[in-house]
Curated annotation (Swiss-Prot):
Residue ranges the record marks as coiled coil: none
Assembly mode: UreD, UreF and UreG form a complex that acts as a GTP-hydrolysis-dependent molecular chaperone, activating the urease apoprotein by helping to assemble the nickel containing metallocenter of UreC. The UreE protein probably delivers the nickel.
Xref: PANTHER family: UREASE ACCESSORY PROTEIN F
Keyword presence, Nucleotide-binding: no
GO CC terms of this entry: cytoplasm
Keyword Cytoplasm: yes
Protein name: Urease accessory protein UreF
Classification lineage: Bacteria, Pseudomonadati, Pseudomonadota, Betaproteobacteria, Burkholderiales
Gene label: ureF
Organism: Burkholderia lata (strain ATCC 17760 / DSM 23089 / LMG 22485 / NCIMB 9086 / R18194 / 383)
Length: 226
């Protein structure tokens, strides 16, 4: 990996990226309300489960395949699979989350003129667009390798989940850093599993997440949008 590719992925995984990731907890806040999370250990276990049981089987392999489709500029497959991913979201708020963040990242890519004109036109025509599809576009525009792209995406997800736990549980900063360190190995394993997953084996089935997310939509008191 070149320094340019590394810096590009650090940029994409940064919490400073203006796509609104900080405003979502992806069910963590609802899990807290259901008393599934109540301290640092249960927060770590929840985030680890989301990484290994949900992302590694669904979002990460989907991202890898969308990355390959952007490289090939396979527009029909990009559009079809993007629509499939959006339809697979288990609740209205999870669908709005991926659409809002995907749109924001796509707008950023267009404004910064990442990628060639033909691919930018394809990106602009994809509405709504899921976050992994937009992330794959940005990564492809910087010629980043698939394993590094997935690692950056997974780390950004873990970091955002940890940040949500710090605010909602609440936890201290050191507890948050311990969670991130503890999940480094799980990120590597999730990436390896995702890269070995063929397109027809991508699986976003996550009933507990779906139920908690649906409950969160009417939760009395909330900090986050999901």
């Amino acid at each position: 990996m070149t320094t340019t590719e590394l810096v590009a992925l650090l940029h994409l995984a940064s919490p400073a990226l203006p796509i609104g990731a900080y405003s979502y907890s992806q069910g963590l806040e609802a899990a807290l309300d259901a008393n599934l999370i109540h301290d640092a250990d249960t927060a770590r276990d929840w985030i680890a489960s989301g990484l290994t049981d949900v992302l590694a089987h669904g979002e990460l392999p989907f991202l890898a395949h969308q990355l390959a489709r952007w490289h090939a500029h396979d527009t029909p497959a990009l559009v079809t699979e993007n629509a499939w991913f959006i339809a697979s979201r288990e609740s209205a708020e999870l669908r709005r989350e991926t659409e809002q963040m995907g749109w924001s990242l796509a707008q950023l890519c267009a404004s910064l003129e990442w990628g060639d004109a033909a691919r930018r036109a394809t990106l602009a025509a994809m509405t709504p667009i899921a976050l992994p599809t937009a992330f794959a576009y940005a990564a492809a525009a910087h010629d980043a390798s698939a394993d590094a792209v997935l690692a950056a995406y997974a780390f950004g997800w873990v970091e955002n989940q940890t940040s949500a736990a710090l605010k909602a549980v609440p936890l201290g900063q050191l507890a948050g850093q311990r969670i991130i360190v503890a999940l480094r190995g799980a990120i590597d394993a999730a990436v390896r599993r995702a890269l070995a997953t063929p397109p027809d084996a991508v699986n976003t089935f996550a009933p507990q997440l779906g139920i908690l997310s649906a409950r969160h939509e009417t939760q009395y008191s909330r900090l986050f949008r999901s």
